[in-house]
Amino acid sequence: MRVTVLDHPLVAHKLSVLREKDTPSPVFRQLVEELVTLLAYEATRDVRVEPVTIQTPVAETQGTALTRPRPLVVPILRAGLGMLEGMTHLIPTAEVGFLGMARDDATLDIITYAERLPDDLTGRQVYVLDPMLATGGTLSEAIKFLYRRGAQDITCVCLLAAPEGLDRLEKELGDSEVNVVLASVDERLDENAYIVPGLGDAGDRLYGVVD
């Protein structure tokens, strides 16, 4: 597993505003979109391309195009949906799938409640969007789900991670070539499995609390 923490002053600035408890939801959503676009630049560093011949207004020349099939972007519902716009700003021709997973707050078990993905992901580059890598349970289960569909080239884009979550991914995924791109690795998890200092519940802050 390869972990990349993006070191950039704009990333640090936007993340600081996200952390602030009084940042309202509309501003929070906009900042997530902007921050994810910055993370996506790094996450797509190894996106597959091929040479193409193009015609400029002056002459024919060689260019570069994304290969087919196009990359697949998979937000983990619901909070991952808030990251989708930022990712597709950078790769608008990507296909989008959806994976609904939630953590049971009582047992901390991961429940899969929805999925909309191709049956066969063999040969596809997949970008998983999940803002908070806390215990690592959700992301680990999502990656295993994608593996069962044939995916091998998986990059996870997250805003924050806890060391415990990264350790769990490393333990459960072994030597698999998963890439994780982050804005920050925070201090720890608290007794409720929230990231400290974190930014609170990303889904609630994106969309408001839904009981």
From Swiss-Prot:
Uracil binds at residues 195, 200-202. Belongs to the UPRTase family. Binds 1 Mg(2+) ion per subunit. The magnesium is bound as Mg-PRPP. 5-phospho-alpha-D-ribose 1-diphosphate binds at residues 78, 103, 130-138, 201. Pathway: Pyrimidine metabolism; UMP biosynthesis via salvage pathway; UMP from uracil: step 1/1. One of its GO terms (biological process) is UMP salvage. Keywords: Allosteric enzyme, Glycosyltransferase, GTP-binding, Magnesium, Nucleotide-binding, Transferase. SUPFAM superfamilies: PRTase-like (SSF53271). HAMAP family: Upp_B (MF_01218_B). Allosterically activated by GTP. It is an enzyme of class 2 (transferase). PANTHER family: ADENINE PHOSPHORIBOSYLTRANSFERASE, URACIL PHOSPHORIBOSYLTRANSFERASE, CHLOROPLASTIC. Its EC number is 2.4.2.9. Catalyzes the conversion of uracil and 5-phospho-alpha-D-ribose 1-diphosphate (PRPP) to UMP and diphosphate. It comes from Kocuria rhizophila (strain ATCC 9341 / DSM 348 / NBRC 103217 / DC2201). It catalyses: UMP + diphosphate = 5-phospho-alpha-D-ribose 1-diphosphate + uracil. This is Uracil phosphoribosyltransferase. Its cofactor is Mg(2+). GO terms for molecular function: GTP binding; magnesium ion binding; uracil phosphoribosyltransferase activity.
